[in-house]
Swiss-Prot record:
Keywords: Nitrogen fixation. NCBIfam families: N2Fix_CO_CowN (NF033689). It comes from Rhodospirillum rubrum (strain ATCC 11170 / ATH 1.1.1 / DSM 467 / LMG 4362 / NCIMB 8255 / S1). Is required to sustain N(2)-dependent growth in the presence of low levels of carbon monoxide (CO). Probably acts by protecting the N(2) fixation ability of the nitrogenase complex, which is inactivated in the presence of CO. Is not required for CO-dependent growth. GO terms for biological process: cellular response to carbon monoxide; nitrogen fixation. Disulfide bonds: none annotated. Disruption phenotype: Strains lacking this gene are not able to grow with N(2) as a nitrogen source in the presence of CO. Belongs to the CowN family. Induction: Up-regulated by RcoM in the presence of CO. Its expression is enhanced in the presence of a poor nitrogen source, like glutamate, that allows nif derepression. This is N(2)-fixation sustaining protein CowN.
Amino acid sequence: MTMDGPAHMPRRYVTFQGVNVEGLSQQLIARILFHVADPAKSNAFWEHFKAKLADADKTLARTADSLCLLCGAIGYIDELFEDNDDEEGLTILRRLEDELC
């Protein structure tokens, strides 16, 4: 099984050969979840984002995979990291934005 379905199916992101799509996405997701686990830092947007993220790995249930969700929320993620002085998160976000979005 790959992040895009059974191993016999072609990968969706073939143009990103040589880029660790899964690893970079998971690093960014970990930084986001670290912050929004604190109810004081979360809001309705992040709760909805977490619900969509939970379905992102379910090929038949998802409306978007994790990379699509991340790329669609760049502005919100940037604001979250800026508000929390998360330089590591911002660095990962810039890399994801430059290499994948």
